[in-house]
């Protein structure tokens, strides 16, 4: 049975064609704010129900509850603030109850917002609670500290879609739910990734697939830290893996356009909620899910799920997988009795170093077809000037 949306109803904040025309005619009169790409894609995520039950950016009550209790003000589990930051100068003529136009970086209006509340926030308090650190080297902390002085909350209505370079990999929740039903999948396991797949990922996915009907591989495309794989590399690598090593009727590959927050445990629950909205009944939570550096304990992202028995999606906790030459394949500590001399630990960092040196990782770490797909790219990793 496809999972019900979080909160019971799939949000739709996309304007009808008639309403779009009306709004477009009104936009010229409204205060306009230009938002960066990561905010713009989250406007779309709200509108298309990926962030259900949110209908807009958080007002202070929901924001405070999420920050302190990891729940919305109605007690529904929700672990990460979804906020719109603004400069006081941008909204100097705006008061609560007004409408404003949200423009993307191309200066094209993408949505209107009904302003419910404008409020101040404490960036340090936000960062400490969300990321468990104030270290400026943490990418989420660094990004938070650069945000603007005020937050503005209220419902949004989408009037224009963004440019989407990954159109052929894009499915909205309303579409995945139809697709899963057409496939007659009653149980669907979601997999979040920001990496190209190695054998450890494949092992975990196939282990989950053995007792569910379908696997939903949902790579995150959007803002990530330098050194992470580029979006197009991840998609090419997964396409190669699925083509050569997965039963074609058991897997759906589609992107999630949003930013990585690197919020570890909180983000693991957030990722599970989003996949529930796509229709997943189960969600794979690996070691150090959504982690970065050493800010979180290895299995902290699994332990947090104990606080959410009412989440409505079943987390699947997996231990680290490795290649055992004695077993002759990929295994985990739970099923392999052999000493370390037989084990090849799969390090994502080590694989990235090999690829940077244009060296093909060995088949005990990564499928050759996947490695070849990655090495076709001259620069497979993100860099920011």
Give the residues covered by each predicted segment.
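Active-site cores that bind ATP or allylic diphosphates and position pyrophosphate for catalysis
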Residues: 1-385
């Amino acid at each position: 049975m496809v999972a019900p949306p979080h909160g019971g109803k799939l949000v739709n904040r996309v304007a009808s064609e008639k309403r779009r025309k009306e709004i477009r005619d009104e936009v010229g009169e409204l205060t306009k704010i230009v938002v960066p790409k990561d905010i713009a894609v989250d406007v779309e995520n709200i509108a298309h129900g990926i962030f259900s039950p949110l209908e807009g950016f958080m007002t202070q009550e929901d924001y405070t509850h999420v920050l302190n209790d990891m729940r919305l003000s109605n007690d529904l589990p929700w672990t990460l603030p979804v906020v719109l930051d603004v400069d006081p100068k941008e909204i100097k003529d705006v008061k609560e109850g007004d409408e404003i136009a949200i423009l993307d970086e191309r200066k094209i209006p993408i949505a209107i917002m009904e302003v419910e509340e404008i409020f101040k926030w404490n960036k340090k308090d936000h960062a400490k609670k969300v990321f468990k650190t104030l270290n400026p080297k943490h990418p989420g902390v660094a990004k938070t500290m650069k945000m603007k002085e005020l937050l503005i909350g209220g419902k949004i209505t989408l009037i224009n879609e963004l440019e989407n370079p990954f159109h052929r990999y894009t499915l909205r929740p309303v579409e995945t739910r139809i697709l899963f039903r057409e496939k007659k999948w009653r149980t669907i396991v979601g997999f979040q990734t920001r990496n190209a797949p190695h054998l450890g990922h494949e092992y975990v996915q196939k282990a989950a697939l053995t007792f569910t009907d379908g696997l939903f591989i949902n790579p995150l495309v959007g803002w990530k830290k330098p050194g992470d794989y580029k979006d197009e590399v991840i998609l090419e690598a997964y396409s190669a893996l699925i083509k050569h090593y997965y039963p074609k009727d058991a897997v759906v590959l589609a992107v999630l356009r949003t930013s990585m927050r690197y919020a570890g445990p909180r983000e693991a629950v957030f990722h599970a909620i989003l996949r529930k909205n796509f229709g997943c009944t189960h969600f794979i939570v690996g070691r150090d899910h959504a982690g970065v550096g050493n800010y979180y304990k290895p299995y902290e992202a699994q332990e947090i799920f104990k606080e959410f028995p009412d989440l409505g999606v079943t987390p699947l906790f997996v231990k680290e997988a490795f290649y055992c030459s004695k077993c002759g394949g990929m295994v985990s500590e739970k099923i392999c009795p052999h000493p370390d001399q037989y084990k090849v630990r799969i390090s994502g960092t080590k694989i990235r170093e090999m690829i940077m040196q244009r060296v093909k990782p060995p088949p005990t770490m990564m499928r050759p077809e996947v490695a070849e797909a990655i090495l076709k790219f001259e620069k497979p990793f993100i860099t920011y000037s």
